[in-house]
Amino acid sequence: RSLLNVLQEEKASRYAGGIYHKTQIELTYNSNHMEGSRLTHEQTRYIFETNTIGVENEVLNVDDVIETANHFRCIDLLIDKAKTALSEKLIKELHFILKTGTSDARKDWFAVGDYKKLPNEVGGRDTALPEEVSEQMRALLAKYNAKKSKTFKDILDFHVCFERIHPFQDGNG
């Protein structure tokens, strides 16, 4: 059995404690943490396992909770489409799922499920200008998809390039 088979089987059965369970919690916690979420690892786990929030004497950002729940759905979609070539359409669909229902979705200038409209930077580093994003993403995807089998280094290189382009206003992590 491949890792993908195990992930698909555990996803279908909602098996607790396996690689699917751990992947959902670890990827969601770490990705959201990089994007500034203040949810703890334990809160992320609790949301995944129970679809509820149990908090006393603590203020939570609603967007953190929404994006956490949405991130679980993004991972499920990636497992479902794992054998499909990575595309702009899929990347935009993931962004749409991630940001739906957040306060960003109510901003006129924020393009949920589409590339950024305004320039942005990451850690003081300039990113691709909005008018450059589409072309740079197409080039990145063409280079990545041209590889017959992807190594771990190929995946890391793709992610570094993706982060340098930073195609979305927010939610690029």
Role assignments for model-derived ranges:
Residues 1-172:
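FIC/Doc superfamily catalytic core
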